[in-house]
Amino acid sequence: MVSERAHMVEFSLLTGLAIGPTVGLFATLAMDLVMARLPEGETPPKVAASVLTGESVDTAPARLATWIHYVAGAGSGLLFVGIAAVLGTALGGSVATLTAASVVQLTLMVGFFAFVPLPRATGVPRGRRARVRRAWAIEATAYVLVAAFVVAAVGRVI
């Protein structure tokens, strides 16, 4: 349940499990809008598909890349809600909680992508990696901003 007390973000475990993937879906749909506008914007999901299949990023299965994108987005929403809940116990569930959760989530998303799948992907030369990392950082920022807004709206933090 969402607590009315002091405008805190407080979710029960069950509510958090239900809300997290929904938050992630909304944030992923917003991310899609950003991805479509960037030169390497649609490359990050293909990076994940490349790692899983061993194929080049440019020939990785599009359907698999899309599936990975949305499943990872839903899972990241669950992670964001969990981080916000944990930080809420320490910071009191205020706007500071969502700010701190956003910083942690963005760091995890960008760091994980830059150090785990991107270096393992096939067909991404060093020069292109920098452009893909930059695109991912912009997309992840959009994701986190929307996730924070949705959690704030649901948790009545705003």
Regions found by a protein language model. Name each.
Residues 1-158:
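Juxtamembrane/disordered regions of integral membrane proteins
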